[in-house]
């Protein structure tokens, strides 16, 4: 099945497909009939009303590798995955080297080149989504968290911050720059500094006020068209670093009596990492306050509030002189500062009442502003929609849903009929959808964040003429790789830059584009959206709308159903609708950010475990399959339809030409291969060799069966008895053939040296996983826990670190350390060391028959591997606890390791070995503590004896008989 917990190839990142492995275990333990086992794995999603387990079962063919290297074509490696699926299907059910027909007609077997691709066509028409597997308790937990979130929403107004301070704007009397930058005093009492920004500067603002009892100061950093990106700073990107803020005060009627104002505390609306507000008043010029917190929050107005240690109050009024030092970073200067002064609020009302009043007042201000900028959007339904690969389908809400394959460079082309009115703005909404990875809005599924998209360029033609854009805005923008990801970058004619919403998958976002001149109404609109970067990242669901509003529009995070409410006059707005607007305000206003963050966390559905599955594509969007000359991805020829290998068995006319039909054909009663191949593989598991030795090749290049009549009888009996694997296993192990002694006599070597005629019982080396599990069982450490993600048992350090990225191996603790080998985490590029040493496959391709080698490293592994040392120490502790004689305990250990009692000679040799080891430990020739390992044994057992038992266990675990069956 080529199971692995990672994707393979260079990056070999982790994947979640262990639920399929657990399904296989449950199915085998329940003795699921093999014909049903086949159908559910190949086509469980095509069964009527498939269960979750039947969907999980389709993960069989998701065990293919996935290449996430930056320079590859994902469609090419999807083709390679398909060739792997065809080859695996051929090996597993047909026992044929079908893969040899990928490049040409099979040289030996009756498999046509065309038939290979017809077989591929059955498997090729499937999408490859992740399946969420929520726990039964997840929904109840989610509902409880939603109820908690609603309780917080209901109390938002009660938490609204109130101004303990009454703010006033003093008169700006003077503003100057130490470096001589030009300055203008503006009507709002701010100062605008312009001209070429010096590397460092000291700005001085002098303000006067008649207010008394001043206990704090607020520095506003305002935006202005004269500043780079409107500011608030004078450096190219608009940031600033305020190294130090100092304040002096003097009576208005005695300005020469100024004194320094001691500053107690500083707090800002935003703080750049490493540049907190407190550093603006720490008397250190090499530190400071800055506001670049990422995204589009930089180029906004910000403020810093500084509290005084003592009130400043002069009866005649006060003259304040504020010094703003900018010494920390070149040109990082505030461009348009304004000073406000605060005094304690005299409001006598209860705090709760004041909070509600403040919330309502803020809501009214927001509502007024929102109404002034409200936009009536008209959604456009495309009259035509095409792309390089995905199918674009119009939805009832006028959105467009993309489905199917995507490439690293994809262009959507859509045609719309414009409304009669001139268009002043075009809106592109990126919408979530449950069919998309992580619910979208993008289709990215590898390399980048799942659900991501990257719009490199947006172009619009109106009436055949290109539209020139004036500006663009977005509700949210973030780049998963690189710097900015803004809507403006989607209209800069550079496809390497663009708009993305990484980090907020599963949410709605929008971008608004303003044309230089209004677009003529009634014209035909041709929109092209270019998606692409080093991974496939097309948009999965979107909607295009336009408006004729004078002045255009700006993108904002406002649900579509609320925008029309802003058009309703206040008197006509029903209380319930007004409450919806108030609720939205409370959930988005910056004053309640902390509580909003908690609400968002509570509303988020708990992350469910996932697994990889297949999902048949819709009938209106089948994936075509082509014959590829010489098996080359880049040489597709004519299209082929699903079909089987004619020489095997005809395809019944009543079966559908899809994966379900293929599965039914494979397990049909007249199919000559599936039952034979399956029973042969089971025979191999017990005898070491199949009745057909070449388990993977029943063709002309394979070996003929040693007992053809037996193979035929077993196959027919297997089908007649419900395809029961457990019955077949019981049948084999209870047979006189299997129960023979495996002892080799001289006549065996002469007439049947390889035991092809079954003249004796099987004697074969155990597989790597069984060797490890046998050691765990013998030591008493084996955990019977079933299911769950892969675990990380101990192995030598550095095994995984040599693979790409230096992946760590977080060694499991507790019971997970000693789980069955079946549950060991499998990394394709760095296989578990002990398994690799004992010839286990890496999961890169289907393997019906393992090679068996004998190397010195295998003996060294059994002797020195950290796992076998732990096992021998655990077994030694257990033997030391027992109360029998030395001989009795040796018999116990021998029976546990080799499942038979020792002979007298073996017992004597082992007892002599135990005594000699104990003597060496007593003589300090060996380190008893190191050999015995950690742990205490109750009673009076000396450390030397416990170490001797560990040494004896280690010797038993290194015997050839332990790793050999028979």
What function would you assign to each model-found segment?
Residues 229-243, 331-337, 438-456, 536-542:
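Short coil-to-beta strand junction motifs in C2/discoidin
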Residues 149-152, 162-202, 206, 225-227, ...:
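Disordered, acidic Ser/Thr/Pro-rich linker "stalks" and the adjacent N-terminal cap
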Residues 3-20, 66-73, 122-148, 345-359, ...:
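Short His/Asp/Glu-rich catalytic/ion-coordination signatures at enzyme active sites or charged loops
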């Amino acid at each position: 099945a080529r199971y692995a917990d990672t994707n393979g190839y260079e990056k070999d990142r982790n994947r979640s497909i262990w639920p399929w492995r657990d399904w296989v275990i449950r199915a085998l333990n329940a003795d699921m009939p093999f014909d049903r086992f086949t159908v559910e794995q190949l086509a469980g999603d095509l069964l009527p009303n498939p269960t979750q387990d039947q969907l999980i079962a389709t993960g069989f063919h998701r065990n293919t590798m996935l290449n996430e290297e930056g320079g590859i074509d994902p469609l090419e490696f999807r083709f390679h995955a398909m060739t792997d699926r065809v080859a695996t299907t051929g090996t597993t059910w047909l026992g044929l080297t079908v893969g040899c027909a990928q490049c040409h007609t099979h040289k030996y077997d009756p498999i046509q080149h065309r038939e290979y691709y017809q077989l591929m066509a059955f498997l090729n028409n499937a999408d490859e989504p992740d399946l969420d597997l929520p726990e039964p308790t997840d929904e109840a937990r989610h509902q409880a968290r939603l109820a908690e979130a609603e309780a917080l929403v209901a109390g938002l107004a009660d938490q609204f911050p109130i101004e303990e301070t009454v703010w006033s704007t003093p008169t700006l009397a003077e503003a100057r720059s130490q470096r001589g930058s030009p300055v203008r005093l503006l009507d709002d009492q701010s100062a605008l500094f312009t001209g070429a920004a010096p590397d460092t500067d000291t700005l001085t603002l002098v303000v006067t006020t008649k207010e008394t009892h001043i206990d704090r100061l607020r520095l506003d950093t305002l935006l202005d068209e004269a500043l780079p990106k409107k500011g608030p700073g004078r450096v190219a990107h608009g940031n600033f670093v305020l190294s130090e803020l100092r304040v002096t005060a003097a009576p208005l009627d005695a300005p020469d009596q100024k004194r320094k104002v001691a500053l107690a505390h500083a707090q800002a609306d935003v703080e750049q990492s490493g540049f907190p507000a407190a550093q603006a008043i720490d008397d250190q010029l090499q530190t400071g306050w800055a506001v670049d917190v990422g995204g589009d929050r930089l180029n906004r107005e910000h403020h810093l509030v500084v509290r005084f240690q003592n009130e400043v109050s002069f009866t005649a009024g006060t003259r304040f002189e504020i010094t703003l030092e900018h010494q920390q970073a070149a040109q990082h200067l505030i461009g348009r500062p304004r000073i406000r002064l605060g005094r304690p609020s005299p409001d006598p009302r209860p705090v709760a009442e004041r909070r509600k009043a403040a919330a309502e007042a803020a809501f009214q201000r927001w509502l007024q502003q929102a109404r002034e900028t409200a936009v009536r959007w008209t959604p456009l339904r495309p009259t035509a929609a095409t792309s390089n690969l995905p199918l674009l389908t119009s939805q009832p809400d006028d959105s467009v849903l993309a489905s199917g394959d995507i490439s690293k460079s994809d262009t959507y082309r859509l045609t719309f009929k414009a409304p009669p009115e001139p268009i002043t703005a075009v809106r592109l909404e990126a919408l979530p959808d449950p069919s998309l990875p992580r619910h979208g809005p993008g289709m990215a599924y590898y390399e980048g964040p799942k659900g991501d998209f990257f719009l490199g360029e947006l172009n619009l033609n109106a009436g055949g003429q290109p539209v020139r854009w004036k500006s663009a805005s977005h509700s949210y923008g973030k780049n998963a790789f690189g710097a900015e990801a803004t809507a403006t970058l989607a209209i800069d004619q550079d496809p390497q830059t663009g708009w993305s919403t990484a980090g907020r998958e599963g949410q709605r976002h929008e971008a608004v584009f303003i044309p230089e001149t209004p677009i003529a109404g009634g014209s035909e609109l041709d929109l092209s959206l270019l998606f692409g970067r080093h991974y496939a990242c097309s948009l999965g669901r979107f909607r295009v709308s336009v408006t004729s509003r004078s002045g255009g529009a700006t993108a904002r995070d406002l649900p579509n159903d609320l925008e029309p409410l802003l058009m309703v006059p206040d008197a006509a707005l029903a209380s319930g609708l007004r409450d919806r607007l108030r609720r939205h305000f409370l959930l988005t206003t910056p004053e309640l950010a902390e509580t909003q963050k908690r609400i968002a966390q509570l509303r988020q559905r708990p992350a469910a475990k996932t697994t990889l599955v297949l999902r048949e594509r819709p009938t209106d969007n089948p994936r075509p399959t082509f014959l590829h000359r010489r098996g080359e991805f880049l040489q597709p020829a004519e299209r082929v339809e699903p079909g089987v290998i004619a020489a095997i068995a005809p395809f019944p006319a009543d079966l559908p030409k899809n994966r379900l039909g293929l599965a039914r054909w494979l397990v049909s009663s007249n199919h000559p291969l599936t039952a034979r191949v399956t029973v042969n593989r089971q025979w191999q598991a017990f005898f070491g060799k199949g009745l057909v030795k070449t388990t993977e090749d029943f063709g002309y290049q394979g070996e003929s069966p040693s007992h053809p009549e037996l193979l035929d009888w077993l196959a027919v009996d297997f089908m007649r008895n419900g395809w029961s694997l457990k019955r077949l296993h019981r049948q084999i192990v209870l047979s006189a053939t299997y129960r023979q002694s495996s002892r080799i006599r001289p006549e065996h070597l002469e007439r049947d040296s390889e035991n092809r005629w079954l003249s004796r019982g099987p004697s074969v080396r155990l597989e790597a996983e069984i060797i490890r599990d046998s050691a765990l069982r013998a030591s008493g450490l084996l955990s019977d826990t079933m299911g769950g993600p892969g675990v990380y048992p101990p192995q030598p350090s550095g095994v995984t670190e040599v693979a790409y990225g230096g992946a760590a191996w977080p060694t499991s603790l507790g019971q997970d350390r000693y789980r069955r080998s079946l549950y060991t985490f499998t990394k394709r590029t760095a296989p578990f060391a002990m398994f690799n040493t004992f010839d286990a496959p890496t999961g890169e391709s289907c393997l019906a028959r393992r090679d068996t080698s004998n190397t010195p490293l295998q003996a060294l592994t059994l002797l020195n591997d950290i796992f076998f040392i732990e096992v021998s120490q655990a077994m030694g502790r257990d033997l030391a606890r027992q109360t029998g004689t030395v001989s009795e305990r040796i018999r116990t250990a021998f029976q546990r390791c080799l499942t038979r009692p020792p002979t007298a000679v073996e017992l004597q040799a082992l007892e002599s070995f135990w005594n000699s080891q104990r003597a060496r430990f007593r003589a300090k020739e060996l380190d008893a503590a190191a050999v015995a390992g950690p742990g205490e044994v109750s009673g009076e057992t000396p450390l030397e004896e416990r170490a001797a038992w560990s040494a004896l266990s280690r010797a038993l675990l290194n015997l050839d008989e332990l790793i050999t069956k028979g």
